[in-house]
A protein has these predicted regions:
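Asp-based, Mg2+/Mn2+-dependent phosphohydrolase catalytic module
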Residues: 1-9, 109, 120-214
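Secondary-structure boundary/capping signal
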Residues: 36-40, 83, 115, 119, ...
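Substrate-recognition element of Asp-dependent hydrolases with the DxDx(T/V) motif
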Residues: 83-133, 143-145
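N-terminal helical cap/lid subdomain that shapes the substrate entry/recognition surface
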Residues: 3-102
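Residue-level marker of alpha-helix boundaries and capping positions
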Residues: 63, 98, 119, 161-162
């Protein structure tokens, strides 16, 4: 399908619209400062992602802040450090201040003229409304990672066909077409492993504009 054939975009929040990795690293810096030597950025993020993935089955029990708090504590234990629950909660609350990528607001403003925009992610209730306002979407269009498949099934007639805008590290999401946003990655000459492979949300806007001219 062409870019202009979709009715809705299901856009991953973190690392597509929100610079989660930079936010996580900044919030982990006090813990990292306690280590002997600074591990590479990629290593820290890989360990963080592993811990979060292992905790995610408990999301319904822990909630978003609880999950991040436990992730902080488990990272400290991995690194042979002590971290208080207060430090863990401070880390969890930092998610409310994670920055948007520079191109995200303008891209969302443009794309909502042509699509229904659905954002896929998790946040605490008190942060969700503010984030939706920053992204220019209605609160009901911010869909939890735990509920997205059921939601899409229930809303099929209103939103399909849907293009899933995600990052390369995320597995294929059901039968949805995929657009991979490869931020901070050089363009690869190898074959694209999705329906679309682009470098940023600004690039998605540019590709859509090209499609309109064809």
């Amino acid at each position: 399908m062409g870019l202009t054939d979709y009715r809705a975009l299901l856009i991953d929040c973190d690392e597509v619209l929100v610079d989660r990795d930079s936010g996580v690293l900044a919030a982990l810096q006090p813990l990292l400062d306690s280590r002997s030597g600074q591990p590479p950025r990629e290593q820290v993020l890989a360990e963080y992602n592993t811990v979060v993935a292992n905790l995610y089955p408990r999301f319904a029990e822990l909630g978003f802040s609880g999950l991040l708090c436990f992730a902080h504590r488990q990272l400290a234990e991995r690194w042979g450090l002590h971290a208080s629950w207060e430090e863990g909660m401070s880390f969890a609350r930092s998610a409310g201040s994670w920055a948007l990528f520079e191109d995200a607001p303008g891209a969302m403003l443009y794309l909502r003229k042509f699509y229904r925009l659905l954002v896929r992610g998790d946040r605490d209730a008190e942060d969700r409304g503010v984030l939706c306002e920053r992204l220019g979407i209605a609160p009901e269009d911010f869909i939890s990672l735990a509920d997205d498949l059921q939601w899409l099934s229930e809303q099929a007639e209103d939103v399909h066909p849907v293009l899933h805008v995600t990052r390369p590290s995320v597995a294929a999401h059901g039968v949805l077409d995929r657009c991979l946003i490869g931020r901070q990655r050089p363009r690869q000459p190898s074959r694209c492993a999705a329906d679309y492979c682009i470098s940023s949300m600004a690039d998605l806007v540019a590709q859509h504009q090209l499609s309109l001219r064809r």
